[in-house]
């Protein structure tokens, strides 16, 4: 998962694991997603997981022009916005109802993200949705 620090627009894609190829694929997908919204990723904060500390991930960040920093070990509050987004996703999407299967839950993820980004009020944004913080005609505002 990724969250834009300014707008709080969230992005999530499911991968089978947290190994290097998956985290690099996620990074590339996140960059493309945010670029489509007019957001350029300049800095990235991650935890200290082995995939994020790898040379492969460092090269991917460098190739994309992203400055990569790490949270302080054992201090998740260093990345509080991301941690809050994770908790919101768990509470409102993953565990927000009883799903018949994991596949059904995963199939509803795009609808939840569309709601979260374009319609869900956010207290830190004056009870406006994250898309309201994006400039111009972006896809979230056009499709809401």
Stretches found by the model and what they are:
Residues 1-11, 22:
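An active-site-proximal beta-strand-loop segment
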Residues 13-37:
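Active-site beta-loop-alpha junctions of metal-dependent nucleic acid enzymes
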Residues 18, 36-54, 74, 127-131:
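Acidic/histidine-rich, metal-coordinating catalytic segments
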Residues 43-48, 62-81, 97-102:
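RNase H-like polynucleotidyl transferase catalytic core
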Residues 64, 88-144:
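C-terminal domain-tail junction helix/linker
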Residues 9-13, 69-71, 95:
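Short small-residue beta-strand/loop micro-motif enriched in glycine and branched aliphatics
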């Amino acid at each position: 998962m990724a969250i834009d620090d300014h707008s709080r627009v969230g992005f999530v894609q499911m991968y089978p694991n947290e190994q290097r190829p998956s985290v690099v694929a996620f990074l590339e997908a996140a960059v493309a997603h945010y670029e489509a919204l007019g957001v350029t990723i300049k800095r990235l904060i991650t935890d200290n997981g082995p995939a994020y500390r790898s040379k492969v991930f460092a090269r991917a960040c460098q190739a994309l022009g992203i400055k990569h920093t790490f949270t302080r070990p054992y201090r998740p509050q260093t990345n509080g916005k991301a941690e809050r987004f994770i908790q919101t996703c768990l509470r409102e999407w993953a565990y927000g109802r009883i799903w018949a299967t994991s596949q059904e839950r995963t199939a509803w993820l795009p609808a939840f993200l569309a709601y979260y980004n374009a319609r869900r009020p956010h207290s830190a944004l004056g009870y406006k949705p994250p898309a309201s913080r994006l400039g111009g005609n972006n896809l979230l505002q056009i499709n809401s």
